[in-house]
């Protein structure tokens, strides 16, 4: 990451944006983790239901975004990093949408994902009544450990050419204990720093990583 103090001076006393200050263009990042689709359903209500004292929701729009490890990928791409991702999606509409959105960024980003025939893609569906979120529907199932070896084989092809390894764990099964241990050890052998966004409450699963970034809730539960 390149950020020289004189850059601020030359550009007019600190008027560079954070994106300009953080130059990721020469950084190769491997992101491994749980891919999700964030689905925001927008709508309104103009009456109550006769069946129960609840509003009748009328959808009038939908916005889809990369979620989970995909959100990390999107942020890194926006910063200019050369990013590759290893994860799992289902052979379904949710998986197709994740691939479609990723391809609008760069067709190579999800070149190494696994499409699991029997797996349901994780979808976080948020219902917005006007600007207020009133409900979240989670469509998900944990990934079988039989995919551990496939994930590790995909990572073996990419990790040696990476400058940073990011493990985005939402505890959906991609980053099993076996995968975590193997990837952290491999990164240490190659002297590649590992950053973990944790979900498991037992942080010993991430032993050997360089940086762990829990939010306050995750930190209190650990």
Predicted features and spans:
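Accessible peptide chain termini
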Residues: 1-2, 18
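Ribokinase/PfkB-type carbohydrate-kinase core domain
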Residues: 14-46, 61-222
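Divalent-cation-assisted or electrostatically stabilized phosphate/pyrophosphate-binding catalytic cores
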Residues: 53-60
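Extended active-site and interfacial segments that coordinate phosphate-rich ligands
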Residues: 47-51
């Amino acid at each position: 990451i390149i950020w020289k103090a004189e850059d601020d001076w030359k550009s007019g006393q600190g008027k560079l944006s954070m994106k300009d200050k953080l130059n990721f263009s020469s950084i190769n990042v491997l992101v491994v983790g749980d891919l999700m689709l964030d689905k925001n359903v927008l709508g309104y209500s103009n009456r109550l239901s006769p069946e129960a004292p609840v509003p009748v929701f009328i959808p009038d729009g939908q916005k889809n975004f990369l979620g989970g490890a995909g959100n990390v990928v999107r942020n890194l791409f926006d910063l200019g990093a050369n990013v590759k991702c290893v994860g799992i999606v289902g052979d379904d509409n949710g998986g197709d949408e994740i691939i479609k959105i990723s391809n609008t960024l760069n067709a190579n980003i999800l070149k190494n994902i696994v499409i699991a025939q029997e797996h349901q893609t994780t979808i976080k569906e948020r219902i917005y009544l006007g600007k207020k979120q009133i409900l979240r529907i989670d469509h998900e199932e944990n990934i079988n450990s039989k995919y551990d070896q496939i994930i590790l084989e995909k990572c073996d092809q990419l990790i040696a050419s990476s400058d940073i390894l990011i493990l985005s764990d939402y505890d959906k099964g991609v980053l099993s204990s076996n995968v975590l241990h193997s990837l952290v050890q491999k990164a240490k052998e190659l002297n590649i720093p590992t950053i973990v966004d944790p979900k498991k409450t037992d942080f010993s699963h991430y032993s050997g990583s360089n940086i762990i970034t829990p939010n306050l809730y995750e930190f209190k539960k650990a």
